Curated annotation (Swiss-Prot):
Pathway info: Metabolic intermediate biosynthesis; chorismate biosynthesis; chorismate from D-erythrose 4-phosphate and phosphoenolpyruvate: step 2/7
Lineage start: Bacteria, Pseudomonadati, Pseudomonadota, Gammaproteobacteria, Lysobacterales
Gene Ontology MF terms: 3-dehydroquinate synthase activity; metal ion binding; nucleotide binding
Biological-process GO terms, alphabetical: amino acid biosynthetic process; aromatic amino acid family biosynthetic process; chorismate biosynthetic process
Annotated gene: aroB
Name of the featured protein: 3-dehydroquinate synthase
PANTHER family, per the entry: 3-DEHYDROQUINATE SYNTHASE, 3-DEHYDROQUINATE SYNTHASE, CHLOROPLASTIC
Record organism: Xanthomonas euvesicatoria pv. vesicatoria (strain 85-10) (Xanthomonas campestris pv. vesicatoria)
Length: 370
């Protein structure tokens, strides 16, 4: 099935605008890829799951379009466990060995981990070089590749070391979703559902109606979901690129979810720990339950969200073995907190997310205890 090309410009105050392009076959478009390299050096950063499928093709496309390019490659182990300061150091070393100058470009070929790591390396090398995001997972296409957040994890918490570094471009080749494992597809759908939950009730309803097509990987349904999700994120990011206010709404479920990920030691291919999308799914349900407990919303909306996530084969309960006290301790390190007080994204029902400062820890503990 041939999908229409979709593009969306993100215009940020005081920052170079960039375009999100969504279509099949984009990784073979060497002229488009190489057109974003201002100098002669490019680093292609990918992971052990994605590189065997696409890295050689991207390298060939770049060199066919620009034979003068010096293209370095770095392949990291797949999974959140690679998003570390050590792996970040490997990316910096790769740039140094390439002889990359300030007009170099880093290409992030992979999912959210690769995008975060490559973006952070680009932000730091010589105080900032270009980064082009080439997302290959649904989660990266609809969330992490858009907006310029880059980071690595440390044992104390997720994404605590990072920078805002908007990409030069986001080029999402939807053909890459054909090789995406079903679990990773579902993880991406959790972030898609988030957009309906925070600001688009009609999209929430559409997702319910199209759930079977989306789970089956129907190309047309996925293209529509990706485009709608990117529209929502781009609109918010353009108004609040540095997350001083409204952009925090995009974190519905993330404070709870990040606590789960950190306490489990982060997910990795082949283990039973929740991946990012799964943890966010659980986190959204917890946020909805807390909202109802605080009198902000009703139980009917909470159940509608839980049911939709369940229908997409996503978890909705805290995994066994995680204590409320341990999760709360992780939540205290969340970047949205102010003056040591919990600041959470909650909601007043489907499509009506809200930033709530100074949430009482006792109320959170009660929700975490179930």
């Amino acid at each position: 099935m041939t999908l229409p090309r979709s593009s969306r410009s993100v215009d940020l105050d005081g920052v170079q605008p960039y375009t999100i392009t969504i279509a099949p076959g984009l990784l073979a478009d060497g002229a488009r890829l190489a057109g974003h390299v201002r100098g002669r050096h490019a680093l292609l950063l990918s992971d052990s799951q994605v590189a065997p499928h696409y890295a050689a093709g991207v390298r060939t496309a770049l060199l066919n379009a620009r034979p003068d390019l010096q293209v370095g490659e770095l392949v990291i182990a797949a999974g959140e466990a690679s998003k570390t300061l050590e792996t970040f150091g490997s990316a910096i070393t790769a740039l140094a060995e390439l002889g990359a100058t300030r007009d170099a470009c880093v290409f992030a070929l992979g999912g959210g981990v690769v995008g975060d790591l490559a973006g952070f390396a680009a932000a730091c090398w010589m105080r900032g070089v270009d980064c082009v995001q080439l997302p290959t997972s649904l989660l990266a296409m609809v969330d992490s590749s858009v907006g310029g957040k880059t980071a690595v994890d440390i044992p104390q918490g997720k994404n605590l070391v990072g920078a805002f570094h908007p990409p030069r471009a986001v080029i999402a080749d939807t053909d890459t979703l054909r090789t995406l494992p079903p679990r990773e597809l579902r993880a991406g759908l959790a972030e898609v559902i988030k957009y309906g939950a925070i600001r688009d009730p009609l999209f929430f309803q559409w997702l319910h109606a199209e759930r079977r097509a989306l789970l089956d990987g129907d190309a047309a349904a996925l293209a529509q979901a990706i485009a709608r999700s990117c529209e929502h994120k781009a609109e918010i990011v353009a108004r609040d690129p540095l997350e001083k206010g409204e952009r925090a709404l995009l974190n519905l479920g993330h404070t709870f979810g990040h606590a789960i990920e950190t306490e489990q030691g982060y997910g990795a291919p082949g283990n039973d720990n929740l991946n990012h999308g799964e943890a966010v799914a659980v986190g959204m349900v917890l946020a909805a339950r807390l909202s109802a407990a605080l009198g902000m919303s009703d139980a009917q909306d909470t159940e509608a969200l839980r049911t939709l996530l369940h229908d997409f084969d996503l978890p909705t309960e805290i995994p066994p073995g995680l204590t409320p006290q341990a999760l709360l301790a992780r939540m205290r390190l969340d970047k949205k907190n102010i003056a040591g007080r919990l600041r959470l994204v909650l909601w007043r029902g489907i499509g009506k997310a809200e930033i709530v400062p100074d949430v009482e820890e006792a109320a959170v503990l009660e929700i975490l205890a179930g």
